[in-house]
């Protein structure tokens, strides 16, 4: 056991985590040169296309160190985006140490800080690594000082390496082996294994990635899932050397995968503890804190026949992505679907794309909203995650909106622009610290504003240099109203939005203008209105298409023309009474584009 090292690689987006993982795999000979590919751990198509890591992946490698000992390295490559920070905290729970990778050109960014503090809170040893020193813009000395100044870790002798060219990667591994402690745990105690991740395989059922804290587990053992009390038989057990390799047992301190023929998707929830069925452990391991989704949106299959397969797909996906939340909902406009909760907009986009690709579904998404806490006049408090669930205004005592605490790191020259942006988003400044040329800003901004397009706007006002990390702070009373959209006098529940009273007229006006672009013209006038309660605040009309009925009159009598026009008018009127308006998918997402192109 003293030769096992479990560690994660944490860093900001694009600081080179996945490339460093590739090099470590190559040096330890996990894959032959023929099987080696760039970003070998980003196995999902989506990850490769977007060039980001979404799922944390684990690998077990053997490394012969300079002192002649053979070490077993279990490492987990983690995502860098703030939407997937939950994946990071899960990976860290399985480790004793973490490699903090910092780009020697970019320096410390907000995610570096956030992930690093998560690691320190979990009592992990953090080893700083300066990556990308082959770049002409690299300034390792300045960045080392920055790490010390902002993060507070001694980085004077941090390993300098370049994952792309492979310089210094061996030193990184040597440093790891020296500094990260061996796992603790008792090989003879009753089995306790933490489930780090699960996914669904069509042939094997549920496959779980586990980290053994105490005891050991063999192929053929009977194990018990502690939260459900179900007993299963272990069919296969093994490790990843990125490839799945079968072994006969996993011992204390190791990370590997097990297949126990669990068919039920909720059979082995992530964060649960596995123990031996014969002599079970007394108490489960401390799991992970459940994450609360920040953004909710309705997802509906385009054809109602897909509802069943959509439900199965969501089940399989939520097994793999523990932060996804869903419950059935029905809408008068869109039929049956699900209300899903996500950690952020990127997460929502990824989930929607995975559903469409991996499960072949056609989906319509409604615009995302955040959760509001509503106090009723009778003293009840309810949580509202969709505008259609908001009670009537006369029953509401107070609506409280979620406030996010946003930490931003940015170069001084963009400070003015960023502050203007935060004020526009109804933000309140709570802290500002200068670190050399960098400024660290803390703002309290309503979650609804952060979630919508704050990240994109922040990047564009600061030319991509600012970085953001946010977390939920509290609920705070605010003057919020629901803006309904009426099409030809009928309310469309899927288009309603909750917004601040001051922004409502402007938001409503912009929304109806946007909708006008997306709704195709019909044979009759379509009135699009935005209303608060019964009070109409904005209207626009999609003009009808009409045939020129006077074309065949040559000169002629005015009463003849009047007759034809009158006849056409009556026809249009009749049409309008029975006509339906088909809304394209873009119309539902028009809300997202409100306030975008300023």
Swiss-Prot record:
<dbReference type="InterPro" id="IPR000795">
    <property type="entry name" value="T_Tr_GTP-bd_dom"/>
</dbReference>
<dbReference type="GO" id="GO:0097216">
    <property type="term" value="F:guanosine tetraphosphate binding"/>
</dbReference>
<dbReference type="Pfam" id="PF00679">
    <property type="entry name" value="EFG_C"/>
</dbReference>
<feature type="binding site">
    <location>
        <begin position="14"/>
        <end position="19"/>
    </location>
    <ligand>
        <name>GTP</name>
    </ligand>
</feature>
<protein>
    <recommendedName>
        <fullName>Elongation factor 4</fullName>
        <ecNumber>3.6.5.n1</ecNumber>
    </recommendedName>
</protein>
<dbReference type="Pfam" id="PF03144">
    <property type="entry name" value="GTP_EFTU_D2"/>
</dbReference>
<dbReference type="InterPro" id="IPR035654">
    <property type="entry name" value="LepA_IV"/>
</dbReference>
<dbReference type="InterPro" id="IPR006297">
    <property type="entry name" value="EF-4"/>
</dbReference>
<dbReference type="InterPro" id="IPR013842">
    <property type="entry name" value="LepA_CTD"/>
</dbReference>
<feature type="domain" description="tr-type G">
    <location>
        <begin position="2"/>
        <end position="184"/>
    </location>
</feature>
<dbReference type="GO" id="GO:0045727">
    <property type="term" value="P:positive regulation of translation"/>
</dbReference>
<keyword id="KW-0997">Cell inner membrane</keyword>
<keyword id="KW-0547">Nucleotide-binding</keyword>
<comment type="function">
    <text>Required for accurate and efficient protein synthesis under certain stress conditions. May act as a fidelity factor of the translation reaction, by catalyzing a one-codon backward translocation of tRNAs on improperly translocated ribosomes. Back-translocation proceeds from a post-translocation (POST) complex to a pre-translocation (PRE) complex, thus giving elongation factor G a second chance to translocate the tRNAs correctly. Binds to ribosomes in a GTP-dependent manner.</text>
</comment>
<dbReference type="InterPro" id="IPR005225">
    <property type="entry name" value="Small_GTP-bd"/>
</dbReference>
<keyword id="KW-0378">Hydrolase</keyword>
<dbReference type="Pfam" id="PF06421">
    <property type="entry name" value="LepA_C"/>
</dbReference>
<feature type="binding site">
    <location>
        <begin position="131"/>
        <end position="134"/>
    </location>
    <ligand>
        <name>GTP</name>
    </ligand>
</feature>
<dbReference type="GO" id="GO:0005886">
    <property type="term" value="C:plasma membrane"/>
</dbReference>
<dbReference type="InterPro" id="IPR000640">
    <property type="entry name" value="EFG_V-like"/>
</dbReference>
<dbReference type="GO" id="GO:0003924">
    <property type="term" value="F:GTPase activity"/>
</dbReference>
<dbReference type="Pfam" id="PF00009">
    <property type="entry name" value="GTP_EFTU"/>
</dbReference>
<dbReference type="InterPro" id="IPR031157">
    <property type="entry name" value="G_TR_CS"/>
</dbReference>
<dbReference type="GO" id="GO:0003746">
    <property type="term" value="F:translation elongation factor activity"/>
</dbReference>
<dbReference type="GO" id="GO:0005525">
    <property type="term" value="F:GTP binding"/>
</dbReference>
<keyword id="KW-0648">Protein biosynthesis</keyword>
<dbReference type="InterPro" id="IPR004161">
    <property type="entry name" value="EFTu-like_2"/>
</dbReference>
<keyword id="KW-1003">Cell membrane</keyword>
<dbReference type="InterPro" id="IPR027417">
    <property type="entry name" value="P-loop_NTPase"/>
</dbReference>
<dbReference type="InterPro" id="IPR035647">
    <property type="entry name" value="EFG_III/V"/>
</dbReference>
<dbReference type="InterPro" id="IPR038363">
    <property type="entry name" value="LepA_C_sf"/>
</dbReference>
<keyword id="KW-0342">GTP-binding</keyword>
<keyword id="KW-0472">Membrane</keyword>
<dbReference type="GO" id="GO:0043022">
    <property type="term" value="F:ribosome binding"/>
</dbReference>
<comment type="similarity">
    <text>Belongs to the TRAFAC class translation factor GTPase superfamily. Classic translation factor GTPase family. LepA subfamily.</text>
</comment>
């Amino acid at each position: 056991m003293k030769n096992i090292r479990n560690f994660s690689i944490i860093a900001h987006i694009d600081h080179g985590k996945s490339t460093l993982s590739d090099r470590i795999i190559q040096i330890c000979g996990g894959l032959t040169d023929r099987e080696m590919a760039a970003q070998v751990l980003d196995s999902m198509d989506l990850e490769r296309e977007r060039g980001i890591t979404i799922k944390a992946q684990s690998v077990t490698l053997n490394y012969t160190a300079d002192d002649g000992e053979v070490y077993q390295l279990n490492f987990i490559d983690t995502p860098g985006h703030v939407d997937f920070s939950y994946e990071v905290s899960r990976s860290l729970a399985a480790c004793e140490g973490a490699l903090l990778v910092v780009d020697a050109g970019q320096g410390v960014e907000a995610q570096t800080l956030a992930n690093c503090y998560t690691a320190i809170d979990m009592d992990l040893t953090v080893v700083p690594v300066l990556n990308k020193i082959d770049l002409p813009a690299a300034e390792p000395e300045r960045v080392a000082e920055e790490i010390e100044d902002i993060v507070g870790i001694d980085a004077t002798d941090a390993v300098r390496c370049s994952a792309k060219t492979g310089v210094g990667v061996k030193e990184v591994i040597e440093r790891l082996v020296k500094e990260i402690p061996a796992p603790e745990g008792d090989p003879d105690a009753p089995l306790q294994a933490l489930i780090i991740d699960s996914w669904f395989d069509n042939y094997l059922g549920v496959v779980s990635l586990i980290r053994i804290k105490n005891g050991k587990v063999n192929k053929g053992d009977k194990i018990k899932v502690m939260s459900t009390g179900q007993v299963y038989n272990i069919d296969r057990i093994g490790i990843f050397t990125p490839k799945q390799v079968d072994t006969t047992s996993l011992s204390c301190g190791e990370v590997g995968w097990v297949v126990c023929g669990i068919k039920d998707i909720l059979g082995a929830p992530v964060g649960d503890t596995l123990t031996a069925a014969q002599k079970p452990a007394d108490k489960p391991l401390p799991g992970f804190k459940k994450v609360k989704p920040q953004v909710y949106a309705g997802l509906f299959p385009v054809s109602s026949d897909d509802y069943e397969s959509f439900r199965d797909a969501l089940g399989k996906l939520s097994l793999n992505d523990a932060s996804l939340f869903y419950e059935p909902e029905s809408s008068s406009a869109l039929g049956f679907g699900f209300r899903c909760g996500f950690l952020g907009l990127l997460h929502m986009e990824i989930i929607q794309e995975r559903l469409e690709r991996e499960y072949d579904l056609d989906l319509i998404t409604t615009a995302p909203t955040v959760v509001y806490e509503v106090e009723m006049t009778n003293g009840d408090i309810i949580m509202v995650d969709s505008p259609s669930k908001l009670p009537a205004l006369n029953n509401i005592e107070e609506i409280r909106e979620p406030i996010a605490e946003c930490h931003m790191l940015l170069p001084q020259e963009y400070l003015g622009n960023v502050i203007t942006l935060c004020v526009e988003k109804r933000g309140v400044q709570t802290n500002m610290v200068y670190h050399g040329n960098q400024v660290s800003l803390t703002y309290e901004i309503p979650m609804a504003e952060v979630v919508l397009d704050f990240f994109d706007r922040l990047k564009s006002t600061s030319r991509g240099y600012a970085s953001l990390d946010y977390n939920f702070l509290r609920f705070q009373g605010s003057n919020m109203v629901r803006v309904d959209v009426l099409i030809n006098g009928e309310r469309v529940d899927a288009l309603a939005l909750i917004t601040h009273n001051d922004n409502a007229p402007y938001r409503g006006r912009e929304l109806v203008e946007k909708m006008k672009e997306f709704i195709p013209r019909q044979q009759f006038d379509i009135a699009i209105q935005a209303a608060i309660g019964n009070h109409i605040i904005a209207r626009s009309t999609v003009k009808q298409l009409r045939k020129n009925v006077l074309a065949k009159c040559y000169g002629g009598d005015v009463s003849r023309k009047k007759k034809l026009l009158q006849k056409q008018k009556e026809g249009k009127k009749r049409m309008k009474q029975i006509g339906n308006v088909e809304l394209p998918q873009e119309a539902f997402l028009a809300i997202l584009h409100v306030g975008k192109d300023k």
